[in-house]
Regions:
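Short, Lys/Arg-rich, polar N-terminal cytosolic tail immediately upstream
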Residues: 1-20
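A structural signal for multi-pass alpha-helical bundles of membrane permease subunits
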Residues: 22-308
């Protein structure tokens, strides 16, 4: 007589392993995240890639059009303007946010009640809901009655036409992004705590100046953390422009703040051109990936040069 293992007996043996063994507990705790990532990120991304090659308006069935949507993007002045504005924002906002987070972390990494309160104040804008944050800046940037221009007028400085002219409006969006660097500040505060104090004591004994110590000890040891923040900001910063551009300017003035997320929304939900919107999203994936790969390769080559 042959013995067979029934599914019920196999599951009975599997359940104790899942609950008691270390590997089983690791899988048990990571399974919700893996399932959520698969269902909410990976599958929608794959579906989006498929829709990019179709003509789809959510009413009629999708119709295969090949690369027509990508040709339409190349020929669209608005799509080219949106991509250029988005890249300009990234090239200004990402380095500025990284430098701001590093500066605040260096100033506030000491202990004490004052520094603890200052860290909380620096982190506070990060937890404000994006809609409320955008409405607050809509009031601050009012060119006639906003507190920013009133303060500049009291100091005898020029009062830019925020939200009216293209240049000041683009600068205003970069300025808004600088007040939500709390997460980067926290990461760099943790990084500063991981640097052994013995390095600074040895440098002090050798008579090194504060600038030399920062340049030769602190900055090199922070570079991996700063690279992580740079890659994160490349992906996240552009996404975070949607609420601000939707609430404050709706892409204006003169399409200056029609960044890719807002244009995606307009194509999909104003014009119901889901195929073209999906193609634009695929292009944004490719551009973001190229930027990330370029930065990683640049840092890798720099590290090899230093090692040589």
């Amino acid at each position: 007589m042959t013995q067979s293992t029934s599914p019920s007996s196999a599951s009975v043996r599997f359940l104790p392993w899942l609950l008691t063994s270390y590997d089983g507990q690791v899988w048990l705790f990571t399974l919700p995240f893996l399932l959520g990532s698969l269902l909410l990120i990976a599958l929608p991304a794959l579906v989006t890639v498929g829709i990019a090659f179709t003509q789809y308006n959510a009413i009629e069935p999708p119709r295969w059009v090949g690369l027509d949507n990508f040709y339409r993007l190349i020929e669209s002045p608005l799509a080219r303007l949106s991509l250029r504005s988005s890249l300009q924002f990234l090239f200004l906002a990402v380095p500025s946010r990284l430098l701001g987070a590093l500066t605040i972390a260096l100033l506030l990494h000491r202990g004490g009640r004052f520094f603890i309160g200052s860290r909380a104040a620096a982190y506070l804008p990060t937890i404000i809901p994006e809609g409320a944050y955008a409405l607050l800046w809509l009031w601050i940037l009012n060119p006639l009655f906003g507190p920013l221009n009133l303060a500049l007028g009291w100091m005898g400085l020029p009062q830019p036409q925020w939200l009216i002219e293209s240049g000041p409006t683009r600068l205003a969006f970069v300025l808004m992004s600088l007040f939500t660097i709390g997460e980067g500040m926290v990461v760099l505060l943790v990084a500063l705590r991981t640097i052994p104090r013995a390095y600074y004591e040895a440098a002090r004994v050798d008579g090194a100046t504060a600038l030399y110590t920062f340049w030769r000890i602190t900055l090199p040891l922070l570079l991996p953390w700063m690279l992580l923040l740079t890659l994160r900001d490349l992906v996240v910063s552009l996404q975070n422009t949607f609420i601000a551009s939707f609430v404050i300017t709706y892409g204006g003035p003169y399409y200056a703040t029609t960044y890719i997320p807002l244009l995606l929304y307009e194509l999909a939900f104003d014009f119901f051109d889901f195929g073209l919107a999906a193609a634009l999203l695929v292009v944004s994936y490719i551009v973001t990936g190229m930027l990330v790969i370029g930065i990683v390769n640049l840092v890798g080559l720099d590290g090899e040069d230093h090692a040589a």
